[in-house]
Amino acid sequence: MSDTIAAIATAHGVGSISIVRLSGERALEFALRFSRKTKLTPRHATFTKLFNQNNEIIDEAIMIYFKAPYSFTGEDIVEFQTHGGFSVSEVLLEELVSLGARFALAGEFSKRACLNGKMTPLKALNIQDLILSKSALAAKIIARNMQGNLGELLEKIRTDLVKTLAFVETSIDYADDDLPSDLLEKISTMCEENSKILKEIYTLSQSKKGLIEGFKIAIIGKPNVGKSSLLNALLSYERAIVSDIAGTTRDTIEESFKLGTHLLRIIDTAGIRESKDTIEQIGVALSKKSLEDADIILAVFDASRVQDKEDEKIFELLANTDKKIFWILNKSDLENVFKNTRNKNFIKLSAQKDIALLKEELQNYLNSFDSEGIMVSSLDLINACKISSEAIFRAKELLEESSLELFAFELNLAINELARFTKDFQRDEILDEMFGNFCLGK
């Protein structure tokens, strides 16, 4: 990491300020050359003119110097706050590269921060998730993780496993010495507790992923019951074509909108019915796939039409789902001839006039989700927690069977999975645990 890297840190486009970030051993040298300054005081904002190599002014800017190791990357960093827009920051970046800097790769500043011990991979992941968060609630959950709660917990579990592995591998090396029964019991309890904690993290993260990613809602029903009108009403603008002709929507339409603090990703599906039309059949198949992916289902029926076989097909399709279903009787402002033979708790509304009741019911349901507890959004981390939990549980069973070599194998697997997000697992740690408490000179 001896080279110096540079990148524009702000979003591309027109704005009042653009930030160019420079990191590496030559960062201060380049900054002094551009500003014609002789020195920069660390952590002080310096107003200056910036010049190119032909001594032509590029811009008036503010420079901030972060001296290593007290910086984001742990290296010397200089940030240039220039005027925004498309040109100034690009010119500055090109000039930096012409002096000897290198265009930074995606995520390279964070990577250097991890390699220099300024943050764990988990924190870097949380920062990325925070940047990409789509709602205030998601940002709150991710920010809570950034405070170290999750990282500290995973590191504690990893440390417990490393210490346990040290005891067990010592026992394997000295096969004549069995592990004391009380120690075996403690190890078994530790495995059970840590496996349970990791399982709670990944199951909670999967069951409440909508709090972070946005809840996915599928609108389902036979053709021409007002699904597209309902979509438009929820979005508060016309996104889907509304027509009296059945089968107008032949593909799924997905849009996002906010309801209170929650992000909702809503899908208008093709009407489900028997059809010989190939295109419509594909649309129906996509509708059924949307049901599988959805967190919430809006099942729509037409109050102005007598219940028929196509309505029955919708009831049958949803009979065995464990998803939350809101039963909606649309067009309730017209003469109501629909018979509620299934005794469903219908929300009666008119998508073209007023859906306030549906929004209220949706918000009450979403607000019932507890945002407390440790949740993660990274699929990679969720899988790591799952793999580790299962490996630790298998290790516990193998310990009870006195299969210490296989126990050590499973524990190694769990340690390595967790280490990807906390710190690198080095085999020397096992040796440190083995001999760290020995007498001096031994």
Swiss-Prot record:
Native organism: Campylobacter jejuni subsp. doylei (strain ATCC BAA-1458 / RM4099 / 269.97)
HAMAP family: GTPase_MnmE
Binding positions for K(+) per the UniProt entry: 224, 243, 245, 248
Membrane-spanning ranges: none
EC number: 3.6.-.-
Binding positions for GTP per the UniProt entry: 224-229, 243-249, 268-271
The protein's name in its UniProt record: tRNA modification GTPase MnmE
Residue span, TrmE-type G domain: 214-367
